[in-house]
Amino acid sequence: LVPINMAVNTAQTILQILVLVLTRNYVVYLSVQIVCSIILMALQNIYITQKYSEVDFSSKDRLPSEKTVEIKRNVSGLIIAKIGDYLVNSTDNLIITKLVSLAATGIYSNYLLIRNMINGFIATLFSGITASMGNVVAVENDEKKLEIFDTVFFCAFLIYSIEATCFMSLYNLFIGDIWIGRNYIFSAGTVAVIVLNNYLTGLRIPLITMKGAAGKYLEDTWIPFGFAIVNLVASILLAKPFGVAGVFLGTIIGSLFTADWYRPFVIYRTVFHAPVKKYFRKYMVYLLLGVGYIALTYWLNAQIYLSNAYLLFLVRGIVSVGVPALLSCALFYRTTEFGAIKTLTIRLVRGTTARLCSKKEDRNG
């Protein structure tokens, strides 16, 4: 399903950009999203029906009552969690509008649009991992589950640390000098807080993925609501003295005081049956390294001056990707997680190369 998701998401992003540029109509922009979502669900249904043709999807057989009750409880927990997540994600814009200004909300929407597009592609990757993790949870022992989780956690660190360095160094350059003008950008300090908040969100994704794969929907249903309350209070208190940066500092505080410490306990206690201190050690290492990568790359890019904004964007982009990637390779190349990702990458490259060569031979034949 990953290629289908990625193809539709790519087409949706391109169409939405064209709609905004050509029509400047937000209703049409949202309509494109709705249509693409319907098309994606239809394609997923066709793929699953063909892939698992041995399954009778029209069967009228009923599940045992205990299974039905379990599914209903899990679905209820999932719905509650989604409502809580919506409350968390929807409060920031409201607080910025009310306590800072409507103009600041408009400026932030530029950053949010770019972030959502990039994160959409990354989410497609992790959506494919969820299904694999579900199989791991079902058939593997606790040690193997933890080993695979550590690899996914490291993968999230690699991806989101590179994304964070790119955002910090390229956000204002792209929005201010290439896209719509320097009147529509935030200060570097505010951008840093926005980037840090997104980075912390990325580091939480492996836990959320494992939670979904293991079906642990009821153990932490209070988390999104607790997160939303702490986020709301902290953001309101910090918005006055620090503006937009204060709102996202409140979000960071909300996550640190709720999801970032409680959810690991749930997963490690109920899925891995292992002590959680190992997770927190890795989390602190990844957090500090991510912040270090952001600071170092931003400083290096600040030393680069070119008159052409497009060329400057290209050069800074190469630096923003290269520095964290090379440093991570140097620091982690002896670890089990790095070895697993290296092996998987080599396997994917070889498989892709073999398929391309096979298609070329078929055409020549």
Where are these regions (language model features)?
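Short alpha-helical transmembrane segments in multi-pass integral membrane proteins
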Residues: 10, 27-49, 112, 148, ...
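Membrane-interface junctions at transmembrane-helix termini in multi-pass inner-membrane proteins
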Residues: 1-3, 27, 195-227, 237
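Membrane-proximal transmembrane or re-entrant/amphipathic helices at the cytosolic face
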Residues: 272-275, 298-365
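Membrane-interface helix-loop junctions in multi-pass transport and translocation proteins
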Residues: 10-42, 50, 218, 225-260, ...
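Transmembrane helical elements of multi-pass membrane transporters/channels
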Residues: 8, 32-44, 48, 64-135, ...
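Alpha-helical transmembrane segments of multi-pass membrane transport and lipid-handling proteins
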Residues: 18-22, 122, 146-202, 232-240, ...
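Helix-loop junctions and terminal segments of transmembrane helices
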Residues: 54-57, 111, 115-153, 208-213
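Interhelical loop/hinge segments that connect adjacent transmembrane helices in multipass membrane
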Residues: 26-30, 44-89, 132, 140-147, ...
